[in-house]
Amino acid sequence: VHGHYPSVPMQPAARLTDLHVCPMVTGVVPHVGGPIVSPGAPTVLIGGLPAARLGDMAVCVGPPDSIVAGAPTVLIAGQPAARLGDSTAHCGVITLGCFTVLIG
């Protein structure tokens, strides 16, 4: 139907401090992953924490990681909203989100 997007599963919204995993390895040192840290959207709080978005950074043992996928139809401060399961630049995924706020 014109004007409708294909069905996208609803996923919990990601926020600063939510975690991601990172499968990369530098030499013999695994990157592991860590929390989403900046910049986020400080004017949009989800479960009391700033919303995470496409382009936001995440802590990693190796070089800094960043969010490279988000909800194409939900923009927060001009960027796609990040969700549980969205990808990072190191081929990892966001593993935590606010389960009371679902974004499709």
Model segments located where?
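Intrinsically disordered, low-complexity proline/glycine-rich segments
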Residues: 1-104
